[in-house]
Structure formats: structure tokens, C-alpha cells
């Protein structure tokens, strides 16, 4: 165990803001000269990251690692559940897939292996960072009475590590007093002393308007309110794809309108964060059945269930709209599963990607790129970098990211119109503008838009078609902007939150 007590961020519910408060806490401790070690025993998310060793982990723990000044490693998130639909999730233990499980069987079959993986992750993380302080994030609510006996990542972990816990409540949702009092009242007597402070999140308005509420909470719970965080949702996108509709509104300076397909099994939507951060770009999320319109480009992001999402696109009429859009000169760009959907054929003999609606193992794609994908149980998990051959310019630009996919994609009939997107030919392809339709491109590289010069060159291609002046390609990697946002988050945290009761209290 570490010499300094572990800290833990619990929440009264899902979406209370635990992930960002944990990231803020990591950055603040780093500023104080500590080595914070972010850790979430079990996470459920299709927004993933691949570490340097090829291990899969939740993106939110990668973000917390960057906040701590560390390289992300899968030990920070030893159990990851990736929803596949039909109450089934893929299970990732210590970075690698160990199978799938239905919700009703998960705790029966996977509780003991999960707890073992969590302990192994803790040991690995502390061994590689001696002297570090664990900063834990809980999951959902810590007092789901029907799940408490099989809890893997909340109070079981807090008790195991004797962690000092802060309880976060989202006042924006309403009912913050009931959230807090109800949660505290459902804690068992042995658990209650672990809660060292309360944190009110997403408060709008003048701070003094909550003074009376703070006095009431402290008088009626005996737990100090560490502070009140203001509304900061404009800094980072939501962790959960269900919250995408709550993202930022229209930008006054937007000059490009880019449609992004809101797939039913959307994954790795953090790929779009660098575009969201561009002041001249407006992203518009389009779900199957909604109007595509005439955007300047369409991006099809990753999917956890590629064939099911492809069927949703085709059956809703969105597929036909995409094909007509491209025939009329529109630009379409696919990432990972999105690129696979752009091809001619997708084969899923093992039913890994949702299966075809008819029960066949092969399904026709959108037919916008001459590609054939065959899915297999082997999963590509690795960080990559390569020189981009497209878009063209005065010199090739380096792009980097990671692969995270099942399946092998090959080009059909040695197409003369379809060219490699970069020097590593298997990473992506591009079919240029022609008399037969607009440009279509795709890549397996998650994070491709994080490269500032490449992103700007891609945007400038769209701007040229609209008669807009080019943007400067002298743009840093998105990681620098992300780091600046983490600093802003930590600045607000230090301004509004008193950490001393959390850091200095005892568990006696």
C-alpha cells in the first residue's frame, strides 16, 4: 500500500461528474509535487484508448493519466466492459479481451476473476510508480442495494484501500439534497466514516445562493461540503455517448458544417474532439432516420457493432442519402468501423460485429470504397504512426493514433482509383473527387484528427471547395489543447474546492 492514503471520488449517480473531478484532482496533486495514480477498477464504456503496450482501457482513465502527467496504462482500468447490445458486453481484463457475458450472468461468473484483475492492476500500478498516491474513481452510485454484495469498484475498493472518499452530486439534475442524504443513509455503518467530504458539481449562478444549502447539509449529515464547482461542461465532452445531444450549441464563427453519424453502437467518439475544438467547424450529429442535408463533409465514426449499425443506416434510408450525397460530390470520411461500412462487402463468419440481419455471414456495405472486410476474433491493438500521402501538400505530414478493431480489410480488384491514405497502406484508403462522385476516404487510425497540421490540411481541402481562405497548418497536436483544458479545470477546482478535509482526515 502507498504511504499516503488513497483518495476516491464517488458519485450519487451516473453522470455526476466523477471522471472530470478525478482528472482535476490528479492535476491539482501533480501541481503539489505528488505522483497521482488514477485508477478505476471497473468501467463500462465503448470510448476506449490503447496504451503503449497494446492494452485496451477506458478513455476517461487515459485522460486522468494525462492530467497526472503519466502515460496511460491499462492497469489504471483493469476491468473494462464494452456494451455490445442485447444486454451483452465484451469483457476486457488488464487490457485484453477475455470473452463476453450477459448482464444476468456477469456477477455470477465474473465477479471473482474481476476482483482478481483489479488487485493485479493495483499491484502493477503501485509497483511501477512507488511513492505515488492512488486517486480512485467510483462507478455509478455506490449504494445500489441489489448490487452491493458483488460491488467491484466502489465501496469494496474503498474499504480494501481505506480510501478517503468525496461524494460528488450534480445539482444541475435537481434533487441534490435527496441525492446526498439518500446515498449517505444507504451506506452501511462500516462505510459511512469513509466519506470525508461532499462536492456539489455543475452549479449555475452566484456561489452565495448555495450558502444556506451548504449549512443544511453539514448540519444534517455531519459531513463537510468541500466546495461548489461551477458549470464547466463547455470544457470537455460528456463521457457517455447518450449525452451527445447535450453538447455545445452552434458556433457563431463556424464556416464548415460537418455531419457525424450518431450510430446506435457508437464507439470512440473522442476521435471527434479535435474537430469539435476547431472554432470554424460546426459538428452536427445525425442519427439514422434523421435528415442528412448537405453538409460540407460527413464523418462515420467507429462502431462496436459494425454490421448492426450498418443495417440501421441502410434500413432507415440514411445509407441511400449518403450514397446520393457522395454521387452529388459530397465528401465522406470513415474511421475504423465507419471505414469498413464504406466498403463493398463485410463478412462476419463468427458473429463478432452484430451479424447480418438475414443470418448470413456477409453483408453489402455502402459501396463507396472498393474494400472487403473479413472479421475475425483476433483484435488489432497497437499505437501507430505513419506519413500521410493524402491530402497532398508541399510535404508529407506525420499522423499518429491507434488501431482498435477486429477484421482485415483489403482493396478489391487492385482498384486504380483507390489509393493508400498513408505509407502504411493497410491503415486507410482514399478515392479522390471525380466525375462519378465526391471524395471518399477511410482509416483504421483512431485519433487521426489529433494531428494539428494534418487536420488543418483536411479542413483546407473542404474550405477550398467553398471558396474560403485556407487555415494555417502550423497547428500543435491536440494533446496541447487538451492539456490546457485540464489546467483550466484544475484552476477552477483549486479556486472552489477545499481539499484539506479530504487529505488530512483519518479513518479512525
Curated annotation (Swiss-Prot):
It holds the Pfam family CbiA. The active site is at 336 (nucleophile), 446. One of its GO terms (biological process) is cobalamin biosynthetic process. Pathway: Cofactor biosynthesis; adenosylcobalamin biosynthesis. GO terms for molecular function: ABC-type vitamin B12 transporter activity; catalytic activity. InterPro entries: Class_I_gatase-like (IPR029062), CobQ/CobB/MinD/ParA_Nub-bd_dom (IPR002586), CobQ_GATase1 (IPR033949), CobQ_synth (IPR004459), GATase_3 (IPR011698), P-loop_NTPase (IPR027417). CDD domains: GATase1_CobQ (cd01750). HAMAP family: CobQ. Catalyzes amidations at positions B, D, E, and G on adenosylcobyrinic A,C-diamide. NH(2) groups are provided by glutamine, and one molecule of ATP is hydrogenolyzed for each amidation. Belongs to the CobB/CobQ family. CobQ subfamily. This is Cobyric acid synthase. It comes from Synechococcus sp. (strain CC9311).
Amino acid at each position: 500500500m502507498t504511504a499516503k492514503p488513497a483518495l476516491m471520488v464517488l458519485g450519487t449517480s451516473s453522470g455526476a461528474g466523477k471522471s472530470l473531478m478525478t482528472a482535476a484532482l490528479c492535476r491539482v496533486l501533480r501541481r503539489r509535487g505528488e505522483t497521482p495514480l488514477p485508477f478505476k477498477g471497473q468501467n463500462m464504456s465503448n470510448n476506449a484508448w490503447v496504451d503503449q503496450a497494446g492494452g485496451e482501457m477506458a478513455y476517461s482513465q487515459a485522460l486522468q493519466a494525462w492530467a497526472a502527467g503519466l502515460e496511460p496504462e491499462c492497469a489504471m482500468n483493469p476491468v473494462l466492459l464494452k456494451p455490445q447490445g442485447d444486454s451483452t458486453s465484451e469483457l476486457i481484463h488488464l487490457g485484453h479481451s477475455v470473452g463476453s457475458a450477459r448482464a444476468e450472468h456477469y456477477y455470477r461468473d465474473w465477479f471473482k476473476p474481476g476482483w482478481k484483475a483489479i488487485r493485479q492492476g493495483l499491484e502493477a500500478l503501485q509497483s511501477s510508480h512507488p511513492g505515488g498516491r492512488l486517486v480512485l474513481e467510483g462507478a455509478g452510485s455506490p449504494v445500489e442495494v441489489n448490487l452491493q454484495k458483488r460491488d467491484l469498484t466502489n465501496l469494496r475498493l474503498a474499504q480494501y484501500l481505506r480510501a478517503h472518499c468525496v461524494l460528488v452530486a450534480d445539482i444541475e439534475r435537481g434533487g441534490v439534497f435527496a441525492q446526498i442524504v439518500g446515498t449517505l443513509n444507504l451506506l452501511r455503518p462500516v462505510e459511512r466514516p469513509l466519506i470525508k467530504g461532499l462536492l456539489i458539481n455543475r452549479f449555475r449562478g452566484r456561489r452565495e445562493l448555495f450558502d444556506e444549502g451548504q449549512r443544511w447539509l453539514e448540519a444534517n449529515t455531519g459531513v463537510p461540503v468541500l466546495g461548489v464547482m461551477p458549470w464547466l461542461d463547455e470544457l470537455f465532452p460528456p463521457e457517455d455517448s447518450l449525452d451527445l445531444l447535450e453538447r455545445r450549441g452552434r458556433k457563431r464563427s463556424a464556416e464548415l458544417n460537418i455531419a457525424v453519424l450518431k450510430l446506435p453502437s457508437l464507439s470512440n467518439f473522442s476521435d471527434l474532439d479535435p474537430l469539435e475544438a476547431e472554432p470554424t467547424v460546426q459538428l452536427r450529429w445525425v442519427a439514422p432516420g434523421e435528415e442528412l442535408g448537405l453538409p460540407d463533409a460527413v464523418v462515420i465514426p467507429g462502431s462496436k457493432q459494425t454490421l448492426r449499425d450498418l443495417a440501421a443506416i441502410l434500413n432507415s434510408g440514411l445509407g441511400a442519402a449518403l450514397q446520393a450525397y457522395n454521387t452529388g460530390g459530397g465528401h465522406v470520411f470513415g474511421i475504423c468501423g465507419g471505414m469498413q461500412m464504406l466498403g463493398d462487402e463485410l463478412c462476419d463468419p463468427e458473429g463478432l460485429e452484430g451479424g447480418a440481419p438475414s443470418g448470413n455471414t456477409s453483408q453489402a456495405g455502402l459501396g463507396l470504397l472498393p474494400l472487403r472486410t473479413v472479421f475475425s476474433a483476433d483484435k488489432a491493438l497497437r499505437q501507430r504512426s505513419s506519413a500521410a500521402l493524402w491530402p497532398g501538400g508541399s510535404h508529407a505530414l506525420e499522423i499518429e493514433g491507434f488501431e482498435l478493431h477486429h477484421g482485415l480489410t483489403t482493396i478489391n480488384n487492385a482498384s486504380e482509383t483507390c489509393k493508400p491514405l498513408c505509407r502504411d497502406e493497410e491503415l486507410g484508403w482514399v478515392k479522390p473527387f471525380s466525375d462519378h462522385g465526391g471524395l471518399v476516404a477511410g482509416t483504421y487510425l483512431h485519433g487521426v484528427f489529433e494531428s494539428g497540421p494534418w487536420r488543418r490540411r483536411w479542413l483546407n481541402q473542404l474550405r477550398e471547395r467553398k471558396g474560403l481562405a485556407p487555415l494555417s497548418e502550423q497547428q500543435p497536436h491536440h494533446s496541447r489543447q487538451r492539456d490546457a483544458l485540464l489546467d483550466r479545470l484544475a484552476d477552477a477546482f483549486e479556486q472552489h474546492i477545499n481539499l484539506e478535509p479530504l487529505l488530512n482526515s483519518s479513518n479512525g
